[in-house]
Protein backbone atom coordinates (compact mmCIF):
# COMPACT_ATOMS: atom_id res chain seq x y z
CA UNK A 1 0.00 0.00 0.00
CA UNK A 2 1.34 3.41 -0.86
CA UNK A 3 2.02 5.87 1.92
CA UNK A 4 -0.61 8.27 0.56
CA UNK A 5 -3.27 5.53 0.60
CA UNK A 6 -2.26 4.51 4.11
CA UNK A 7 -2.46 8.08 5.38
CA UNK A 8 -5.86 8.56 3.76
CA UNK A 9 -7.13 5.31 5.25
CA UNK A 10 -5.92 6.35 8.73
CA UNK A 11 -7.59 9.74 8.36
CA UNK A 12 -10.90 8.20 7.33
CA UNK A 13 -10.76 5.69 10.18
CA UNK A 14 -10.07 8.52 12.64
CA UNK A 15 -13.17 10.36 11.39
CA UNK A 16 -15.42 7.27 11.50
CA UNK A 17 -14.28 6.00 14.89
CA UNK A 18 -13.22 9.23 16.59
CA UNK A 19 -13.97 10.12 20.20
CA UNK A 20 -17.19 11.87 19.17
CA UNK A 21 -18.37 9.17 16.78
CA UNK A 22 -21.68 9.00 18.64
CA UNK A 23 -25.04 8.95 16.84
CA UNK A 24 -27.33 11.50 18.47
CA UNK A 25 -31.00 10.80 19.29
CA UNK A 26 -33.62 11.56 16.63
CA UNK A 27 -35.19 14.45 18.58
CA UNK A 28 -32.03 16.57 18.28
CA UNK A 29 -32.56 19.30 15.66
CA UNK A 30 -29.24 21.10 15.52
CA UNK A 31 -25.70 21.29 16.83
CA UNK A 32 -24.38 24.84 17.09
CA UNK A 33 -20.77 25.89 17.62
CA UNK A 34 -19.59 29.47 17.97
CA UNK A 35 -15.96 30.53 18.23
CA UNK A 36 -13.45 33.02 16.89
CA UNK A 37 -10.70 32.21 14.40
CA UNK A 38 -8.45 34.48 16.45
CA UNK A 39 -7.11 32.11 19.10
CA UNK A 40 -6.44 34.76 21.71
CA UNK A 41 -8.65 35.09 24.80
CA UNK A 42 -9.39 31.37 25.11
CA UNK A 43 -10.59 30.37 21.64
CA UNK A 44 -7.72 28.01 20.70
CA UNK A 45 -9.29 24.87 22.23
CA UNK A 46 -12.58 25.54 20.44
CA UNK A 47 -10.76 26.09 17.15
CA UNK A 48 -8.89 22.78 17.51
CA UNK A 49 -12.11 21.01 18.55
CA UNK A 50 -13.83 22.09 15.33
CA UNK A 51 -10.89 20.95 13.22
CA UNK A 52 -10.12 17.63 14.94
CA UNK A 53 -13.28 16.35 16.66
CA UNK A 54 -16.28 17.83 14.86
CA UNK A 55 -15.80 15.80 11.63
CA UNK A 56 -16.36 12.58 13.59
CA UNK A 57 -19.60 13.88 15.13
CA UNK A 58 -20.77 15.12 11.73
CA UNK A 59 -19.95 11.80 10.02
CA UNK A 60 -22.07 9.85 12.50
CA UNK A 61 -24.98 12.33 12.34
CA UNK A 62 -25.04 13.18 8.66
CA UNK A 63 -28.68 14.33 8.40
CA UNK A 64 -28.41 16.66 11.39
CA UNK A 65 -28.00 20.42 10.95
CA UNK A 66 -24.59 21.69 12.07
CA UNK A 67 -24.32 25.46 12.49
CA UNK A 68 -20.67 26.53 12.84
CA UNK A 69 -20.05 30.25 13.35
CA UNK A 70 -16.35 31.14 13.34
CA UNK A 71 -16.96 34.89 13.21
CA UNK A 72 -17.73 35.32 16.89
CA UNK A 73 -16.10 38.45 18.37
CA UNK A 74 -13.01 37.45 20.31
CA UNK A 75 -14.32 38.87 23.59
CA UNK A 76 -17.38 36.56 23.58
CA UNK A 77 -17.38 33.01 24.95
CA UNK A 78 -16.98 30.10 22.50
CA UNK A 79 -19.84 27.62 22.97
CA UNK A 80 -21.03 24.19 21.85
CA UNK A 81 -24.83 23.82 21.99
CA UNK A 82 -27.35 21.10 21.23
CA UNK A 83 -30.84 22.21 20.23
CA UNK A 84 -34.06 20.19 20.40
CA UNK A 85 -37.61 21.51 19.98
CA UNK A 86 -36.13 24.98 19.34
CA UNK A 87 -34.62 25.02 22.84
CA UNK A 88 -31.01 24.65 23.90
CA UNK A 89 -30.90 21.41 25.89
CA UNK A 90 -27.12 21.38 26.38
CA UNK A 91 -24.57 24.18 26.26
CA UNK A 92 -20.85 23.95 26.95
CA UNK A 93 -18.47 26.86 27.55
CA UNK A 94 -15.20 26.15 25.69
CA UNK A 95 -13.30 29.27 26.78
CA UNK A 96 -9.70 28.69 27.90
CA UNK A 97 -10.00 24.90 27.79
CA UNK A 98 -7.73 22.49 26.00
CA UNK A 99 -8.90 20.17 23.25
CA UNK A 100 -8.71 17.02 25.41
CA UNK A 101 -10.88 18.57 28.14
CA UNK A 102 -13.46 19.86 25.67
CA UNK A 103 -13.62 16.54 23.84
CA UNK A 104 -13.98 14.39 26.96
CA UNK A 105 -16.59 16.69 28.58
CA UNK A 106 -18.72 16.81 25.42
CA UNK A 107 -18.30 13.06 24.89
CA UNK A 108 -19.63 12.38 28.41
CA UNK A 109 -22.58 14.72 27.85
CA UNK A 110 -23.44 13.15 24.48
CA UNK A 111 -23.34 9.63 25.92
CA UNK A 112 -25.57 10.74 28.79
CA UNK A 113 -27.97 12.41 26.36
CA UNK A 114 -28.01 9.26 24.22
CA UNK A 115 -28.64 7.09 27.30
CA UNK A 116 -31.48 9.33 28.54
CA UNK A 117 -33.33 9.06 25.24
CA UNK A 118 -32.92 5.29 24.79
CA UNK A 119 -36.24 3.42 24.34
CA UNK A 120 -35.92 1.65 27.71
CA UNK A 121 -35.50 4.92 29.59
CA UNK A 122 -38.33 6.62 27.70
CA UNK A 123 -40.68 3.71 28.55
CA UNK A 124 -39.55 3.87 32.18
CA UNK A 125 -40.18 7.62 32.30
CA UNK A 126 -43.69 7.13 30.89
CA UNK A 127 -44.38 4.45 33.51
CA UNK A 128 -43.33 6.86 36.25
CA UNK A 129 -45.46 9.70 34.86
CA UNK A 130 -48.56 7.57 34.50
CA UNK A 131 -51.01 7.55 37.35
CA UNK A 132 -54.16 5.41 37.09
CA UNK A 133 -57.48 7.25 37.15
CA UNK A 134 -59.11 7.35 40.55
CA UNK A 135 -62.64 6.01 41.01
Swiss-Prot record:
Keywords, in A-Z order: Mitochondrion, Ribonucleoprotein, Ribosomal protein
GO molecular function, one term: structural constituent of ribosome
GO BP field: mitochondrial translation
Main localization, broad class: mitochondrion
Record's keyword annotation contains Translocase: no
Cellular component per GO, a single term: mitochondrial large ribosomal subunit
Stretch list, region Disordered: 114-135
Superkingdom in the source lineage: Eukaryota
Cellular compartments annotated: Mitochondrion
Stretches with biased composition (Basic and acidic residues): 114-129
Subunit structure, as described in the record: Component of the mitochondrial large ribosomal subunit (mt-LSU). Mature yeast 74S mitochondrial ribosomes consist of a small (37S) and a large (54S) subunit. The 37S small subunit contains a 15S ribosomal RNA (15S mt-rRNA) and at least 32 different proteins. The 54S large subunit contains a 21S rRNA (21S mt-rRNA) and at least 45 different proteins.
Physiological role: Component of the mitochondrial ribosome (mitoribosome), a dedicated translation machinery responsible for the synthesis of mitochondrial genome-encoded proteins, including at least some of the essential transmembrane subunits of the mitochondrial respiratory chain. The mitoribosomes are attached to the mitochondrial inner membrane and translation products are cotranslationally integrated into the membrane. mL61 is not essential in cells grown at 30 degrees Celsius but is required for mitochondrial translation in cells grown at 18 degrees Celsius.
Family under the similarity heading: Belongs to the mitochondrion-specific ribosomal protein mL61 family.
Protein name, entry field: Large ribosomal subunit protein mL61
Organism from which the protein derives: Schizosaccharomyces pombe (strain 972 / ATCC 24843)
Amino acid sequence: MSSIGGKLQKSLHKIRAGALGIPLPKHIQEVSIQYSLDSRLGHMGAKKFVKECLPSLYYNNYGLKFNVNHRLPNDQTPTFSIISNNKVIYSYDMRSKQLETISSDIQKALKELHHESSPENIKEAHKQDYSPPSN
